[in-house]
Structure formats: structure tokens, C-alpha cells
């Protein structure tokens, strides 16, 4: 290729030389026309010029003698003509003038030659680059050839290993044949002995011994398999314990940092106390100077100072309590370290696996008990001070209530609280405030009521959204005496945490559980679905109503309109009724509540709700909070401890009514005798006797019965189907309300929702499937708390991806309005876009968002603006996951028109139809491993509870040993198969059949071997 290019370049250069030589030859002409133009008269004499040039060249090459000889041969006329022509040519004055033109042409040709030389150099460089690429490709080809050769070598090795395995198999067959030969030899010997001595008792005993040895080998094999299985669980438990130790060390550091911050804050509080004391002294002096004789005011001021001192003392006591709990936490950490040391020492001994497993479980139970004792430790009692009032308005009136600090440290993840001292500010009278941390681990409730003060203690914790924050607004006309104010505040302050949402049962213990040892709850509808232990006490229907009563209070502000009065009276979250002295303030309370209620609700007074439910047909997309709870929240709990099997017919019917399945009672009321009837019923019985044709209704009933027979208390069982219809509004899918309401889909069914269930509910869009999947994951992350979703903007300056996950569809539309995309925000209605889909779904990216918003592709600035704010909102980790998803080879852009295709069984799979059905039934919309780790979304590619950063090299080596042990298990299984085949051949022998009737011991062993 390079030689062809060089030949082309040489030809081009030769052509240029010829052109230049021809141009020089034209200098001799004296014409005024361009010799290269088609109209030039020299075009015909160009040949003569070439001949003259050739003549000149030949003459220069000849010698003098040859020139003279040639001159003699030229005719005289020709010579004279040439002389005249040449002399006249030299005497004319045209040559110098025309020479300039030719010189210009020559210069132009020289320039063209230089440009061609440059082009030649460029072409040369390109040729060299192409040569480099060719060499690189040849190198890659060599590498691929080497890889192919390596693959062929591996294939040869695999073939060799296969042949070696076949030879081993042949060896085993040869051994079996040898054993058969030995067996025949033994049989011949037996016949000889029988003929000679007629005594075969010894031989029978040997045969029995052989049988016993074979059975012992089988038992040893089973023991080895059990030990290997226990080794796997032990390694998993060891790794989980390492993770727990790492978490405990991290929490220890956090607690130490918190302790240091609390020390600094205590010092700042002391400084504030000194400043307050100096301020009080100054005010006292001022009062003494201005109002002599008013000793009562001075005494009140002293009382106020004493109360402030008591407040600081309570803070110091709380700090000491936290120090004590930190020490307890350190002791528990030391116990974990000791337990880890014992595990490391005992992990190499094969015979102590089971004991180690038992000891680790016992130690974990002891640690869990120690942590539960920590949580039962009393919190410091609140020190309350009554406010003071100055009737003359000459001094600064102050109302200060002590901060109530309650620290609740869970088993593994104690939260930290950082308190900051605010800047000096003058504040108008503010309502009582209550602060709590999101996860409920550490709660700081502060009741501060000031009119004008120099300093105010604030907390950096997030404000609670509970009803305890909705207090009275003070005004100038609301100033009362000291005694009346303290009497009004007494009921509210005696229960400082009455407005906080309750901790779900089992939350603390669930954090103590081993992530490898937790029992994964799955729905199974097989033959043993309704088996319940006889001594197991189940939860009754009134208990479910009681727990529902607790969550219904803080689910929605408008939900108070649907609650009966007796449930409000028994609820721990209700606001105490105003006293006669504070009747003036009730109007302010209702005004404040009216501002904070949901937009769909029309009233807040329970007496205004004349109709409990919507009467004009099915569930509409705008129903909102008009939907009430299906359960009677005011039931008595007299049969709380009665097992479901002993429930009467009326109780079972009422329970079915609460589950929303009351329509089947007319056809099945005669069939239901007690709770045992439902527990023993099969799928066919439910469909035939109760007439339940709807598959989701049968699934709902079976899940509810399974929950009654389970000892676990979960929050998803407390969410009924009316809550799910409101939840569809929150995630932006109100168009499916009718289908979900007809299917009576509740929180438990959401937890176990499968793809087939969604398809039966007529949800066929891929986007809507992913929306429901990520919404269920958000509910699992938040432990199915009814009010975990964020419907309204709170603090826009501190938006984290964990908070964006909780955004509803309406909140996302509010965010679009805040980023100047208000005209496109209504396009998200009914799209299923919520915070969980935006953050947790890798396939949902900016392009999908822009398509759903109907932003045209040509509006690049708008799309860039949306991408900037979208990436800032979801965080860096979610961006990385979305980029990884886009880089996958099978990535397809998520659109609103994509449909879910139901799986179809091929013709070859009809033999395994039952197995296929079971596998499809386990295909959950949201897999069980998603959202199980509370407080964070599961990391991509890792199992919940595992963190690869905490693994050491020893752990990885042990994992490799576990993989090797699995190979050992397979070898043992193959060896046991050979032993079983050998014993089977021995049993089929006629010798054993003959002696089975003679010897009773032989018959016993035969029966044992047949088992």
C-alpha cells in the first residue's frame, strides 16, 4: 500500500517537472497571446519549440567533431533560415516584455508545486497513521488468537478432566465388579462351610455387621451434611456479628461526639444562666428603683429565677443520664467484642460448630436483653415552672418551661441529637413547640412560651408533624393571671409526649435480629396454609380495631371527622378539651386547624359528617378523605386472648365485615360454624361455600387468616382497603381506585402483591407497575407507617433524597411549580410519578420525566433546566444508578405507552405446570428484599444487612471454604449413592432372602434398611 502511494507521488512530481520545463520553453516565443489558450497562434508551433529544445539537447551532448560533421550535412538554405529567424528574434524587443508574464506563470507553477508537496506530506502522514492502525489491528488479532488458543487449551483441559472422571467412574465400576466377585467367592465359601459344618451363625453375624456398618456410614454422611449446613449458617451469623460490631463502634464514636457537643452546650447553657442571673439582678434593681413597696413582684422574679435554675439543673440531670447510657452502651460493645473473640477462637474446630452456634445465639439474646434494659431506664422527670406576668408592663415578662429530654437508645442504631444555641433575638409570643427525631429514637420536647427575651434555646432537630405542635396562638387579649395560665397548661404538660406517634410493636426487637437469621415472611397457599399450633394465642378482631384506632388519629387531619366520639375519648393522641377559662382560645385553635387540614375535606367537626360514606356509586378519583375506616374503632376487647378457632359465628361474620367481605355472608352464613371452619377451608371450599369467585378476595382472606395465626405484629396489617384507595391518590394513580376497591386491596395485600395480581386489576402499564413497586418499597422502608408520605412542602432548604422518597404526586407537582415549571405540572396527574419512583427507580430518568411533562424535544433549555433541578433533587447516588442503568446493553427508555406482557407457558412446559405456577406466584411486584433494611434503600447488588466494606480477608477465605465445602457435599452425595446401590444389590441377593426367615435379627436389619 505504501509502495503504491510512493509511485503515485513520483508520477505527480515528474508531471510537474514536465509542466515547468514546458513553461520555460515558451520563454523563447515573442507572441502576445497566451500559448496555453485554445486561440493562441503558438498552439500549432508548440511542436517546433519542442523540436528546438530537443536539438539543443542533442547538440550539447555531441562532441565538436560530430557537431562539425552535422553542420556540413545541413543544407545552406536551412541554416540561413534558422540564422535569420534567430537574429530577428534577438533584435525584437518582445522577448523581455513577454518574459515577465512567463515568469509569473513559472512562479505560480512553483507555488502549485509547493502546495502539492505539502499535500504529499499530509498524505504521507495519513499513510503512516493508517499503517499504525493496521499494526494495532494486527496486534489485536494476535491477542484474540492467543485468547482463542487459551480457550482451546482450557477446553482440552476440561476434556481431560472429563476423561479422568470417566476413568474414575470405570474404576468404581471395576471395584463394584470386584466386590461382586468377592461376594460370589464369599457365597462359595458359605456353601463350602454349609456343606462341611452346617453352621452359618458366624457368617450371618458378619453380614449383619456389614449392614450395620453401611447404616453407620449413611448416618455419618447425614451428620456431615448437617454440619456443613450449620457451618454455612454459622459463617453467616459470624459475618452479621462482625457487621454489628462495626456498627456498634461507629455508634460509639457518634455517641462520644454527641457527648462532647452536649458538654459544650452545657457550658453555653451555664453562660446563658449567668447572663440571665445578671439580667434578673438588673431588672430587680430597676424594679426596686421604680416601684418601691411592690415586694410581691420582686418575690415573683426570684421565683422565676429559681425556676430557671431548676430548668438548667434538669438539663444537667438529663446530660448525666445520657452519660450513663453511653457507659452502658460501651459495656454492651465490650460484650460484643468478647463474643467475637470467642467466635474467632472456635471457628476452626469442626466438632464445636453446633456449640458455637448455640453460644452465639444465647449471647445475642443476652445482649438483646441488656439493650432492652437500657430502654426501660427511666427518663428524667420534667421540671415545670409557672409563668410570670407583670401587671404594670414595666419589665420584660417571661414564661419559660423546662426542656424535657427523653433518650431512647435502640439495640443497634442509637440516634444522635445535636443541640445548638441560637443567636440573640427578640421574638414575639410563640406557641408551644415539640421537637422529635424522625425515627423516634431520641425525642426532645420543648415547651417554650415567651413574649420578649434575649436568648432562646432551640434545637437543630426536625419539627414534628404530629398534632402536638398545633397549639394555641397567644394574643394581647389572652393574658391571664399566673394561676389560670398554669391550670390551663397542666393537662398538656403532664403528658409531654402524648401527641407523638406510637412506636410500632416489635420495632426495637426487629433491629436486634440477626439479618441472616430473620424469618422472611412469604405468602404460601398450599395444603398446610392454615396449620396453627394449639397453644398459640392469636390476636382477635377487637385488638385489630384497637391498633387501627391508634393509627387513624394521625393518618390524616380530616380523618377526625369520621371517628366516633368514644374512640376520641380513649385515644392517647387527642387534644384535651379546653377549660372554661380558655373558651376564648378555642376559636383560635379551630382557625389554626382549618389552615392545616387537607384541601379535599370540607369540615373538621365530627357532628357535621351526616353520611359516613359516599352514596353515589363507586370510588371516584376525587373521593379523598371522604372514605372512612371499615372497622369499628370503638369495639370492646373482651375476647382479646381468644384463639380464632374458638370464635363464634357472629364474631367471624363481624370480622369478615371488617375485612370488607360482608357481601359473601348471605350465601355462606349457614356454612360458617366457628373460626375453625375458615381455618380448615380449602380454596374450593371458599369458592363453593362462601361463593368467593374473586381471586384477590380469596388471597385477602387467606393472608388475614395467616396473620391471625402468626406471632408477628406488622404495620401493613393495620392498613385497610380504604387507606389503600387514598394511597393511590398519593402516588398519582387515582384511575385504579375502582379496581382496587372492588378487589378490597389492603396493606397486607400490597406487601404480597404479585405481577399477576396487578394484571388482574387491569394495571398493564410498565410505568405504573414500577410506580406501585417503588411506592411499596417506600412503605417498607418506613415500616408501613400510615402518615409517612409528605403531601405538603416543609423545609425547602434541607431536602435529602431520603425525604424526596416520601413525596406524593401532589408534592412533586408543587416542586415543579417551585422550579418555574408550573405550566407543565398538571401533566403529572394520573401519571404515577412520586418521590419514590424518582429516587429509587434506575430506569426513571430526566428523559422519561420530560416526556411525561410533554416538554417538546426542541425546547432544549427547558429540558436542561429540568435536568439540573432533577439531578440536584435525587442526589449523587441515584444519578449514578440511573447512569449505570442507561449503560446496560438491554436498556430501553421508559415511556408511558409501554405495556407489561403476561408470561405464557410454552408447549414443552406442560409437564411442570404446577411448578411453573408456584414460581409465577412468587414473582412479587416489589421483591421481598427491597425495603427490608429500614432507614435506607437497599444497595444495588448487595443483600440487605451486608456491607462488603466490613469484610476482611479472613471472611472472604472462609466464604471460599464454604464454596469448597459444597463440592465436598456433592462428593459425599455421590459416594452415598454408590453405597446405596451396593446395599440394594445385596438385598436383592437370594442369600439374604434365605436367611431372613431363619434369623430374627437379620429380618430386623432388613426392615431397617428398607426404611
From Swiss-Prot:
Belongs to the liprin family. Liprin-beta subfamily. Residues 470-492, 546-556 have a biased composition (Basic and acidic residues). It comes from Homo sapiens (Human). The lineage of its organism: Eukaryota, Metazoa, Chordata, Craniata, Vertebrata. Residues 420-439, 463-634 are annotated as: Disordered. Forms homodimers and heterodimers. Interacts with S100A4 in a Ca(2+)-dependent mode. Part of a cortical microtubule stabilization complex (CMSC) composed of KANK1, PPFIA1, PPFIBP1, ERC1/ELKS, PHLDB2/LL5beta, CLASPs, KIF21A and possibly additional interactors; within CMSCs KANK1 and PHLDB2/LL5beta seem to be the core components for recruiting microtubule-binding proteins KIF21A and CLASPs, whereas PPFIA1, PPFIBP1 and ERC1/ELKS serve as scaffolds for protein clustering. Interacts with KANK1 (via CC1 domain, residues 244-339). Widely expressed. Absent in liver. It is found in: Cytoplasm, Cell cortex. Residues 647-711, 719-782, 804-876 form the SAM domain. It comes from the Eukaryota. One of its GO terms (molecular function) is cadherin binding. The N-terminal coiled coil regions mediate homodimerization preferentially and heterodimerization type beta/beta. The C-terminal, non-coiled coil regions mediate heterodimerization type beta/alpha and interaction with S100A4. One of its GO terms (biological process) is neuromuscular junction development. Residues 156-405 form a coiled coil. This is Liprin-beta-1. Keywords: Acetylation, Coiled coil, Cytoplasm, Disease variant, Epilepsy, Intellectual disability, Isopeptide bond, Phosphoprotein, Repeat, Ubl conjugation.
Amino acid at each position: 500500500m505504501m509502495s503504491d502511494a510512493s509511485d503515485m507521488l513520483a508520477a505527480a512530481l515528474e508531471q510537474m517537472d514536465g509542466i515547468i520545463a514546458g513553461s520555460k520553453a515558451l520563454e523563447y516565443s515573442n507572441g502576445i497571446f497566451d500559448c496555453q489558450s485554445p486561440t493562441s497562434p503558438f498552439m500549432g508551433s508548440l511542436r517546433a519549440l519542442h523540436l528546438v529544445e530537443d536539438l539543443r539537447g542533442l547538440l550539447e551532448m555531441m562532441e565538436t567533431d560530430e557537431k562539425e560533421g552535422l553542420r556540413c550535412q545541413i543544407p545552406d538554405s536551412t541554416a540561413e533560415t534558422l540564422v535569420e529567424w534567430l537574429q530577428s528574434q534577438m533584435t525584437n524587443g518582445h522577448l523581455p516584455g513577454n518574459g515577465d508574464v512567463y515568469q509569473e506563470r513559472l512562479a505560480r507553477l512553483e507555488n502549485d508545486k509547493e502546495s502539492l508537496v505539502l499535500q504529499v506530506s499530509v498524505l504521507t502522514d495519513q499513510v503512516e497513521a493508517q499503517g499504525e492502525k493496521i499494526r494495532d489491528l494486527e496486534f489485536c488479532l494476535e491477542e484474540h488468537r492467543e485468547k482463542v488458543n487459551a480457550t482451546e487449551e482450557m477446553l482440552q483441559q476440561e476434556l481431560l478432566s472429563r476423561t479422568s472422571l470417566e476413568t474414575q467412574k470405570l474404576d468404581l465400576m471395576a471395584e463394584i465388579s470386584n466386590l461382586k466377585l468377592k461376594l460370589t467367592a464369599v457365597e462359595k465359601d458359605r456353601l463350602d462351610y454349609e456343606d462341611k459344618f452346617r453352621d452359618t451363625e458366624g457368617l450371618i453375624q458378619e453380614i449383619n455387621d456389614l449392614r450395620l456398618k453401611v447404616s453407620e456410614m449413611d448416618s455419618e454422611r447425614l451428620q456431615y451434611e448437617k454440619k456443613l449446613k450449620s457451618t454455612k449458617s454459622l459463617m453467616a451469623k459470624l459475618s452479621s456479628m462482625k457487621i454489628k460490631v462495626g456498627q456498634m463502634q461507629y455508634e460509639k464514636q457518634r455517641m462520644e461526639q454527641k457527648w462532647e457537643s452536649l458538654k459544650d452546650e452545657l457550658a453555653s447553657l451555664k453562660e446563658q444562666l449567668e447572663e440571665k442571673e445578671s439580667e434578673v439582678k438588673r431588672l430587680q434593681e430597676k424594679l426596686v428603683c421604680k416601684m418601691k413597696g411592690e415586694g410581691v413582684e420582686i418575690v415573683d422574679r426570684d421565683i422565676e429565677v429559681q425556676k430557671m435554675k431548676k430548668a438548667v439543673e434538669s438539663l444537667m440531670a438529663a446530660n448525666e443520664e445520657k452519660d450513663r447510657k453511653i457507659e452502658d452502651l460501651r459495656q454492651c460493645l465490650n460484650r460484643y467484642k468478647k463474643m467475637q473473640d470467642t467466635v474467632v477462637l472456635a471457628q476452626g474446630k469442626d466438632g464445636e460448630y453446633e456449640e458455637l452456634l448455640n453460644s452465639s445465639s444465647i449471647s445475642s439474646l443476652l445482649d438483646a436483653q441488656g439493650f432492652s434494659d437500657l430502654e426501660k431506664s427511666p427518663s428524667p422527670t420534667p421540671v415545670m415552672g409557672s409563668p410570670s406576668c407583670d401587671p404594670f408592663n414595666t419589665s420584660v415578662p417571661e414564661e419559660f418551661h423546662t426542656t424535657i429530654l427523653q433518650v431512647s437508645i435502640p439495640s443497634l442504631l442509637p440516634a444522635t441529637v445535636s443541640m445548638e444555641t441560637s443567636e440573640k433575638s427578640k421574638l414575639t409570643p410563640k406557641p408551644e413547640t415539640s421537637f422529635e427525631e424522625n425515627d423516634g429514637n431520641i425525642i426532645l420536647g420543648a415547651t417554650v412560651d415567651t413574649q420578649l427575651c434575649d436568648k432562646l434555646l432551640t434545637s437543630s432537630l426536625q419539627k414534628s408533624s404530629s398534632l402536638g405542635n398545633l397549639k394555641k396562638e397567644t394574643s394581647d387579649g389572652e393574658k391571664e393571671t399566673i394561676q389560670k395560665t398554669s391550670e390551663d397548661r397542666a393537662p398538656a404538660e403532664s403528658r409531654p409526649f402524648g401527641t407523638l406517634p406510637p412506636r410500632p410493636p416489635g420495632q426495637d426487637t426487629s433491629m436486634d435480629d440477626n439479618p441472616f437469621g430473620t424469618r422472611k415472611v412469604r405468602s404460601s397457599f398450599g395444603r398446610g396454609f392454615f396449620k396453627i399450633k394449639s397453644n398459640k394465642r392469636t390476636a382477635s378482631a377487637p385488638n385489630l380495631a384497637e391498633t387501627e384506632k391508634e393509627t387513624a388519629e394521625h393518618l390524616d387531619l380530616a380523618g377526625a371527622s369520621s371517628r366516633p366520639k368514644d374512640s376520641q375519648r380513649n385515644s392517647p393522641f387527642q387534644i384535651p378539651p379546653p377549660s372554661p377559662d380558655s373558651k376564648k382560645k378555642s376559636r383560635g385553635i379551630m382557625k389554626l386547624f382549618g389552615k392545616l387540614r387537607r384541601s379535599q375535606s370540607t369540615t373538621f367537626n365530627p357532628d357535621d359528617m351526616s353520611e359516613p360514606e359516599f352514596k353515589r356509586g363507586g370510588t371516584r378519583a376525587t373521593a379523598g378523605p371522604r372514605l372512612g375506616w371499615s372497622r369499628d374503632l370503638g369495639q370492646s376487647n373482651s375476647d382479646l386472648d381468644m384463639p380464632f378457632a374458638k370464635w363464634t359465628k357472629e364474631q367471624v361474620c363481624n370480622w369478615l365485615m371488617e375485612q370488607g367481605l360482608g357481601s359473601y355472608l348471605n350465601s355462606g352464613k349457614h356454612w360458617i360454624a366457628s373460626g375453625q371452619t375458615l381455618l380448615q377451608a380449602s380454596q374450593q371450599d371458599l369458592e363453593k361455600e362462601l361463593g368467593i369467585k374473586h381471586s384477590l378476595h380469596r388471597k385477602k382472606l387467606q393472608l388475614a387468616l395467616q396473620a391471625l395465626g402468626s406471632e408477628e405484629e406488622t404495620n401493613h396489617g393495620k392498613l385497610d382497603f380504604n387507606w389503600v384507595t387514598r394511597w393511590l391518590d398519593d402516588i398519582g394513580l387515582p384511575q385504579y381506585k375502582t379496581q382496587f376497591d372492588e378487589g378490597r386491596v389492603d396493606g397486607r395485600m400490597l406487601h404480597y402483591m404479585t405481577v399477576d395480581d396487578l394484571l388482574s386489576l387491569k394495571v398493564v402499564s410498565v410505568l405504573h407497575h414500577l410506580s406501585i413497586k417503588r411506592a411499596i418499597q417506600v412503605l417498607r422502608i418506613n415500616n408501613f407507617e400510615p402518615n409517612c408520605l409528605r403531601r405538603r412542602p416543609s423545609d425547602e432548604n434541607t431536602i435529602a433524597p431520603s425525604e424526596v422518597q416520601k413525596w406524593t404526586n401532589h408534592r412533586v407537582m408543587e416542586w415543579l411549580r417551585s422550579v418555574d415549571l408550573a405550566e407543565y405540572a398538571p401533566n403529572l396527574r394520573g401519571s404515577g410519578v412520586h418521590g419514590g419512583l424518582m429516587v429509587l427507580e434506575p430506569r426513571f430518568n430526566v428523559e422519561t420525566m420530560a416526556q411525561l411533562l410533554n416538554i417538546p424535544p426542541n425546547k432544549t433549555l427547558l429540558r436542561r433546566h429540568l435536568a439540573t433541578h432533577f439531578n440536584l433533587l435525587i442526589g449523587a447516588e441515584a444519578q449514578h444508578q440511573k447512569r449505570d442503568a442507561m449503560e446496560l446493553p438491554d436498556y430501553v427508555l421508559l415511556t408511558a405507552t409501554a405495556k407489561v406482557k403476561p408470561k405464557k407457558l410454552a408447549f414443552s412446559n406442560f409437564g411442570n405446570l404446577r411448578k411453573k405456577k408456584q414460581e409465577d406466584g412468587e414473582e412479587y411486584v416489589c421483591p421481598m428484599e427491597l425495603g427490608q433494611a429500614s432507614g435506607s434503600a437497599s444497595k444495588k447488588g448487595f443483600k440487605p444487612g451486608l456491607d462488603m466494606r466490613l469484610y476482611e480477608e479472613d471472611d472472604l477465605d472462609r466464604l471460599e471454604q464454604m464454596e469448597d465445602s459444597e463440592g465436598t457435599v456433592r462428593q459425599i452425595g455421590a459416594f452415598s449413592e454408590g453405597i446405596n446401590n451396593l446395599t440394594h444389590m445385596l438385598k436383592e441377593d437370594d442369600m439374604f432372602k434365605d436367611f431372613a426367615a431363619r434369623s430374627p435379627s437379620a429380618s430386623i436389619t432388613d426392615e431397617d434398611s428398607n426404611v
